[in-house]
Protein backbone atom coordinates (compact mmCIF):
# COMPACT_ATOMS: atom_id res chain seq x y z
CA UNK A 1 0.00 0.00 0.00
CA UNK A 2 1.39 3.38 -1.01
CA UNK A 3 2.21 5.94 1.66
CA UNK A 4 -0.81 8.19 1.81
CA UNK A 5 -2.89 10.66 3.80
CA UNK A 6 -6.67 10.85 3.84
CA UNK A 7 -9.10 13.02 5.76
CA UNK A 8 -12.60 12.60 7.13
CA UNK A 9 -15.17 14.39 9.25
CA UNK A 10 -17.90 13.18 11.58
CA UNK A 11 -20.56 14.54 13.93
CA UNK A 12 -21.62 17.22 11.42
CA UNK A 13 -18.08 18.54 11.19
CA UNK A 14 -17.51 18.42 14.93
CA UNK A 15 -14.79 15.80 14.54
CA UNK A 16 -11.83 16.08 12.21
CA UNK A 17 -9.92 12.91 11.36
CA UNK A 18 -6.67 12.42 9.46
CA UNK A 19 -5.04 9.10 8.69
CA UNK A 20 -1.52 8.42 7.44
CA UNK A 21 0.29 5.36 6.16
CA UNK A 22 4.03 6.03 6.28
CA UNK A 23 5.59 2.57 5.89
CA UNK A 24 7.79 3.25 2.88
CA UNK A 25 9.07 6.65 3.93
CA UNK A 26 9.92 5.29 7.39
CA UNK A 27 11.81 2.41 5.78
CA UNK A 28 13.68 4.89 3.57
CA UNK A 29 14.68 6.90 6.64
CA UNK A 30 15.82 3.69 8.37
CA UNK A 31 17.94 2.67 5.40
CA UNK A 32 19.42 6.12 4.77
CA UNK A 33 20.43 6.71 8.38
CA UNK A 34 21.15 3.04 9.22
CA UNK A 35 18.85 3.33 12.22
CA UNK A 36 18.52 0.85 15.04
CA UNK A 37 15.12 -0.68 15.75
CA UNK A 38 14.21 1.78 18.49
CA UNK A 39 15.59 4.77 16.57
CA UNK A 40 13.49 3.72 13.56
CA UNK A 41 10.36 3.60 15.72
CA UNK A 42 11.09 6.99 17.27
CA UNK A 43 11.79 8.77 13.98
CA UNK A 44 8.94 7.01 12.19
CA UNK A 45 6.44 8.10 14.82
CA UNK A 46 7.74 11.67 14.73
CA UNK A 47 7.65 11.89 10.93
CA UNK A 48 4.09 10.58 10.93
CA UNK A 49 3.12 13.11 13.60
CA UNK A 50 4.70 15.90 11.55
CA UNK A 51 2.70 14.94 8.47
CA UNK A 52 -0.51 14.79 10.50
CA UNK A 53 0.09 18.26 11.95
CA UNK A 54 1.11 19.74 8.60
CA UNK A 55 -2.12 18.47 7.01
CA UNK A 56 -4.08 21.04 9.02
CA UNK A 57 -2.23 24.00 7.50
CA UNK A 58 -3.80 26.00 4.68
CA UNK A 59 -1.18 27.99 2.78
CA UNK A 60 0.84 26.31 0.02
CA UNK A 61 4.43 25.78 1.10
CA UNK A 62 3.58 25.55 4.81
CA UNK A 63 5.77 23.29 6.93
CA UNK A 64 5.97 21.97 10.48
CA UNK A 65 9.17 21.26 12.39
CA UNK A 66 9.15 18.92 15.37
CA UNK A 67 12.22 18.79 17.58
CA UNK A 68 12.35 16.49 20.57
CA UNK A 69 15.18 16.79 23.07
CA UNK A 70 15.10 14.27 25.89
CA UNK A 71 17.42 12.93 28.55
CA UNK A 72 17.61 9.45 27.01
CA UNK A 73 20.48 7.91 25.01
CA UNK A 74 18.87 8.76 21.66
CA UNK A 75 19.60 12.41 22.43
CA UNK A 76 16.88 13.91 20.31
CA UNK A 77 15.39 14.08 16.85
CA UNK A 78 14.27 16.63 14.28
CA UNK A 79 11.51 16.29 11.70
CA UNK A 80 10.54 18.66 8.89
CA UNK A 81 7.13 17.91 7.32
CA UNK A 82 5.21 19.81 4.66
CA UNK A 83 1.62 20.36 3.64
CA UNK A 84 2.77 18.98 0.26
CA UNK A 85 3.24 15.51 1.78
CA UNK A 86 7.02 15.54 1.97
CA UNK A 87 8.96 14.79 5.13
CA UNK A 88 12.53 14.31 6.27
CA UNK A 89 14.22 13.85 9.62
CA UNK A 90 17.07 12.47 11.67
CA UNK A 91 17.98 11.35 15.17
CA UNK A 92 21.06 12.44 17.10
CA UNK A 93 22.28 8.92 17.95
CA UNK A 94 20.98 6.54 15.26
CA UNK A 95 22.67 3.37 16.53
CA UNK A 96 21.24 3.34 20.07
CA UNK A 97 19.40 0.13 20.94
CA UNK A 98 17.50 -0.76 24.10
CA UNK A 99 15.80 -3.90 25.45
CA UNK A 100 12.00 -4.06 25.01
CA UNK A 101 9.92 -2.24 27.60
CA UNK A 102 7.66 -3.90 30.17
CA UNK A 103 4.99 -4.47 27.52
CA UNK A 104 7.44 -6.16 25.18
CA UNK A 105 7.46 -3.19 22.81
CA UNK A 106 10.29 -1.07 21.48
CA UNK A 107 11.24 1.30 24.29
CA UNK A 108 10.91 4.61 22.46
CA UNK A 109 10.21 6.45 25.72
CA UNK A 110 13.36 5.07 27.28
CA UNK A 111 15.42 5.96 24.22
CA UNK A 112 14.17 9.55 23.99
CA UNK A 113 13.83 10.00 27.75
CA UNK A 114 10.92 11.00 29.94
CA UNK A 115 12.37 14.41 30.74
CA UNK A 116 12.89 17.05 28.11
CA UNK A 117 10.98 19.18 25.66
CA UNK A 118 9.01 19.06 22.44
CA UNK A 119 9.49 22.10 20.23
CA UNK A 120 6.98 22.73 17.44
CA UNK A 121 7.48 25.38 14.76
CA UNK A 122 4.80 26.13 12.18
CA UNK A 123 6.00 28.09 9.14
CA UNK A 124 3.35 29.34 6.73
CA UNK A 125 5.89 30.86 4.37
CA UNK A 126 5.63 34.50 5.41
CA UNK A 127 6.10 36.52 8.57
CA UNK A 128 7.53 34.96 11.68
CA UNK A 129 7.03 31.22 12.22
CA UNK A 130 4.79 30.27 15.13
CA UNK A 131 6.69 28.29 17.76
CA UNK A 132 5.62 26.48 20.90
CA UNK A 133 7.39 24.42 23.56
CA UNK A 134 5.94 21.82 25.92
CA UNK A 135 7.52 19.43 28.38
CA UNK A 136 7.69 15.77 27.44
CA UNK A 137 5.04 13.56 29.00
CA UNK A 138 6.46 10.11 28.26
CA UNK A 139 8.96 10.40 25.42
CA UNK A 140 6.76 8.03 23.39
CA UNK A 141 6.08 10.84 20.86
CA UNK A 142 2.31 10.29 20.60
CA UNK A 143 1.62 11.32 24.21
CA UNK A 144 3.89 14.31 23.83
CA UNK A 145 2.31 15.60 20.61
CA UNK A 146 -1.16 15.08 22.11
CA UNK A 147 -0.05 17.17 25.10
CA UNK A 148 1.13 19.89 22.71
CA UNK A 149 -2.22 19.93 20.92
CA UNK A 150 -4.13 20.19 24.19
CA UNK A 151 -1.99 22.91 25.76
CA UNK A 152 -0.75 25.01 22.85
CA UNK A 153 -3.60 24.64 20.37
CA UNK A 154 -6.27 23.93 22.99
CA UNK A 155 -7.82 21.23 20.82
CA UNK A 156 -8.98 17.96 22.42
CA UNK A 157 -7.18 15.32 20.37
CA UNK A 158 -6.51 11.61 20.20
CA UNK A 159 -3.36 10.51 18.41
CA UNK A 160 -2.28 6.99 17.48
CA UNK A 161 1.21 6.43 16.10
CA UNK A 162 2.87 3.14 15.28
CA UNK A 163 5.92 1.61 13.61
CA UNK A 164 6.54 -2.12 13.21
CA UNK A 165 10.13 -2.91 12.31
CA UNK A 166 11.75 -6.31 12.11
CA UNK A 167 14.66 -8.09 10.47
CA UNK A 168 13.30 -7.24 7.01
CA UNK A 169 12.92 -3.55 7.83
CA UNK A 170 9.76 -1.52 8.36
CA UNK A 171 6.63 -3.46 7.42
CA UNK A 172 3.97 -1.16 8.89
CA UNK A 173 3.93 2.48 9.98
CA UNK A 174 1.43 5.28 10.24
CA UNK A 175 -1.01 7.04 12.49
CA UNK A 176 -4.42 8.55 13.13
CA UNK A 177 -5.27 12.00 14.45
CA UNK A 178 -8.80 12.62 15.73
CA UNK A 179 -9.72 16.11 16.91
CA UNK A 180 -12.89 17.55 18.41
CA UNK A 181 -13.39 20.93 16.79
CA UNK A 182 -14.35 24.02 18.84
CA UNK A 183 -18.04 23.89 17.94
CA UNK A 184 -18.30 20.38 19.42
CA UNK A 185 -15.74 20.60 22.21
CA UNK A 186 -18.44 21.37 24.78
CA UNK A 187 -20.25 18.14 23.96
CA UNK A 188 -18.82 16.10 26.82
CA UNK A 189 -20.60 12.93 25.72
CA UNK A 190 -19.06 13.14 22.25
CA UNK A 191 -15.58 13.73 23.66
CA UNK A 192 -16.01 10.83 26.11
CA UNK A 193 -17.22 8.51 23.34
CA UNK A 194 -14.22 9.31 21.18
CA UNK A 195 -11.76 8.89 24.04
CA UNK A 196 -13.31 5.55 25.00
CA UNK A 197 -13.14 4.13 21.49
CA UNK A 198 -9.54 5.17 20.97
CA UNK A 199 -8.49 3.77 24.36
CA UNK A 200 -9.92 0.37 23.41
CA UNK A 201 -7.64 0.08 20.37
CA UNK A 202 -4.47 -1.96 20.76
CA UNK A 203 -2.50 0.52 18.65
CA UNK A 204 -2.14 1.61 15.04
CA UNK A 205 0.20 -1.02 13.61
CA UNK A 206 -1.93 -4.00 14.75
CA UNK A 207 -4.81 -2.50 12.76
CA UNK A 208 -2.65 -1.96 9.68
CA UNK A 209 -1.01 -5.39 9.89
CA UNK A 210 -4.43 -7.03 10.21
CA UNK A 211 -5.27 -5.72 6.76
CA UNK A 212 -7.38 -2.72 7.70
CA UNK A 213 -7.18 0.31 5.45
CA UNK A 214 -7.45 3.89 6.65
CA UNK A 215 -11.15 4.06 5.65
CA UNK A 216 -11.70 0.82 7.59
CA UNK A 217 -10.18 2.42 10.68
CA UNK A 218 -12.30 5.55 10.30
CA UNK A 219 -15.39 3.37 9.94
CA UNK A 220 -14.53 1.43 13.09
CA UNK A 221 -14.11 4.61 15.13
CA UNK A 222 -16.61 7.01 13.58
CA UNK A 223 -18.96 4.96 11.43
CA UNK A 224 -22.04 5.65 13.56
CA UNK A 225 -21.25 9.34 14.02
CA UNK A 226 -22.06 10.57 10.52
CA UNK A 227 -18.69 9.71 9.01
CA UNK A 228 -17.79 11.48 5.76
CA UNK A 229 -14.51 10.39 4.14
CA UNK A 230 -13.12 13.03 1.79
CA UNK A 231 -12.28 11.66 -1.67
CA UNK A 232 -8.81 13.20 -2.00
CA UNK A 233 -5.86 10.89 -1.34
CA UNK A 234 -2.51 12.62 -0.86
CA UNK A 235 0.62 10.61 -1.60
CA UNK A 236 3.48 10.98 0.88
CA UNK A 237 7.23 10.57 0.50
CA UNK A 238 10.57 11.04 2.20
CA UNK A 239 12.12 13.99 0.42
CA UNK A 240 15.07 16.21 1.25
CA UNK A 241 15.72 19.65 -0.20
CA UNK A 242 19.49 19.38 0.03
CA UNK A 243 21.56 19.75 -3.16
CA UNK A 244 25.14 20.15 -4.31
CA UNK A 245 24.40 23.80 -5.08
CA UNK A 246 23.40 24.38 -1.46
CA UNK A 247 26.52 22.61 -0.26
CA UNK A 248 28.69 24.89 -2.38
CA UNK A 249 26.82 27.90 -1.01
CA UNK A 250 27.53 26.77 2.55
CA UNK A 251 31.20 26.17 1.78
CA UNK A 252 31.48 29.60 0.20
CA UNK A 253 30.38 31.17 3.47
CA UNK A 254 33.50 29.75 5.15
CA UNK A 255 35.63 32.34 3.38
CA UNK A 256 38.75 32.29 1.22
CA UNK A 257 41.26 31.32 3.91
CA UNK A 258 39.30 28.27 5.07
CA UNK A 259 38.66 27.13 1.51
CA UNK A 260 42.34 27.44 0.63
CA UNK A 261 43.22 25.41 3.71
CA UNK A 262 40.83 22.65 2.58
CA UNK A 263 42.47 22.58 -0.85
CA UNK A 264 45.96 22.28 0.60
CA UNK A 265 45.21 19.80 3.39
CA UNK A 266 42.31 17.71 2.06
CA UNK A 267 42.33 18.32 -1.70
CA UNK A 268 38.63 19.11 -1.47
CA UNK A 269 35.75 18.85 0.97
CA UNK A 270 33.06 16.37 1.96
CA UNK A 271 29.66 17.24 3.41
CA UNK A 272 26.90 14.96 4.68
CA UNK A 273 23.28 16.11 4.94
CA UNK A 274 21.94 15.50 8.45
CA UNK A 275 18.39 15.05 7.20
CA UNK A 276 19.00 12.36 4.57
CA UNK A 277 22.65 11.24 4.96
CA UNK A 278 23.42 12.13 1.33
CA UNK A 279 27.17 12.63 0.92
CA UNK A 280 28.48 15.43 -1.31
CA UNK A 281 32.07 15.68 -2.59
CA UNK A 282 33.51 19.05 -3.56
CA UNK A 283 36.79 18.78 -5.46
CA UNK A 284 39.70 21.18 -5.18
CA UNK A 285 38.55 22.65 -8.50
CA UNK A 286 35.13 23.39 -6.99
CA UNK A 287 36.75 25.10 -4.02
CA UNK A 288 39.10 27.06 -6.26
CA UNK A 289 36.10 28.33 -8.21
CA UNK A 290 34.46 29.44 -4.97
CA UNK A 291 37.61 31.38 -4.09
CA UNK A 292 37.56 33.04 -7.51
CA UNK A 293 33.91 33.96 -6.98
CA UNK A 294 34.70 35.51 -3.59
CA UNK A 295 37.54 37.56 -5.05
CA UNK A 296 35.35 38.76 -7.92
CA UNK A 297 32.61 39.78 -5.51
CA UNK A 298 35.15 41.57 -3.33
CA UNK A 299 36.45 43.60 -6.27
CA UNK A 300 32.91 44.39 -7.40
CA UNK A 301 31.94 45.75 -4.00
Swiss-Prot record:
Q: Name one GO biological process term.
A: protein refolding
Its GO CC terms are: cytoplasm
Q: Which UniProt keywords apply?
A: Chaperone, Cytoplasm, Disulfide bond, Redox-active center, Zinc
Which Gene Ontology molecular-function terms are recorded?
A: protein folding chaperone; unfolded protein binding
**Intrachain S-S bonds:** 240-242, 273-276
Similarity comment text for this entry: Belongs to the HSP33 family.
Please state where this protein is localized: Cytoplasm
Species classification: Bacteria, Bacillati, Cyanobacteriota, Cyanophyceae, Oscillatoriophycideae
For the keyword Zinc, the answer is yes
Keyword Transit peptide appears in the UniProt entry: no
From the UniProt record, report the name of the gene that encodes this protein. hslO
Query: What does this protein's UniProt record list under function?
Result: Redox regulated molecular chaperone. Protects both thermally unfolding and oxidatively damaged proteins from irreversible aggregation. Plays an important role in the bacterial defense system toward oxidative stress.
Write down a Pfam family by its short name.
HSP33
Q: Which InterPro entries match?
A: Heat_shock_Hsp33 (IPR000397), Heat_shock_Hsp33_C (IPR016154), Heat_shock_Hsp33_N (IPR016153)
Top-level taxon in the UniProt lineage: Bacteria
Fill in the PTM field for this protein. Answer: Under oxidizing conditions two disulfide bonds are formed involving the reactive cysteines. Under reducing conditions zinc is bound to the reactive cysteines and the protein is inactive.
Full protein name: 33 kDa chaperonin
Amino acid sequence: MADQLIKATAADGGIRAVGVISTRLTEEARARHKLSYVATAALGRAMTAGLLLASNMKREGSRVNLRIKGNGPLGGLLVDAGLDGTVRGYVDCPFVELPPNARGKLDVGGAIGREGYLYVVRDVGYGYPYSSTVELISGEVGDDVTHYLATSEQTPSALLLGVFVGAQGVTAAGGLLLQVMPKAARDEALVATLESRVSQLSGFTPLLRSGKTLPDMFEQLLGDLGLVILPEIQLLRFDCRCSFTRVLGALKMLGEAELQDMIEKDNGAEATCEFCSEVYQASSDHLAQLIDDLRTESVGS
